[in-house]
Amino acid sequence: MMYIIYGVIAGAIVLGWIINKFDKKEPNVKFKSKEMPHMKPLSIPTKGVGFWKGILMWVTTSRKWEITKDWHYSINTGTYVIPKGFIFDGASVPKFFRSWLSPMGVLLMGGLIHDYGYKYQTLLYATKKTTTGKSSQKGMDETFRDVNISVNGFFVLNYLAYYGLRIGGFLAWKKHRKANCDWKADI
């Protein structure tokens, strides 16, 4: 039995080494941020909901985070901001994958920008007076992918996350389009 476990571990190491050898392209965008986003966790309201609903919430709900200080960043030559008070849940990684890929880990910055873009269908310039204009779901998914590649350098991982978004992201996109959130009301 131990040979199987060691074999799987050795296979994963060799596979990681091979992927790393070919995972050396230049990112599509230049991303910069002077600091990490300042954020606080929000509680998951499970108290008083009953046993079964509490279990369901535990299995299906993701923790939400609130930005506590305007977070400034740049993509290529544009400078943008995620305003204080914005609430997001990070990269929507299915719970069964979170042991290996945390939504608040290497996908954090791209996930934050992506969540803002999904909610408002645009990115907010640092002046807080104008936006990039309406973006498509695919455009926001590409921003997520390209920012994360620029931040963490993992092409294969970020392309896998990108294709996951292309397959399942339409649910969140449609939910936000139905809510019709206005960025001006939230700054």
Model-derived features: positions:
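Extended terminal accessory/targeting regions
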Residues: 2-187
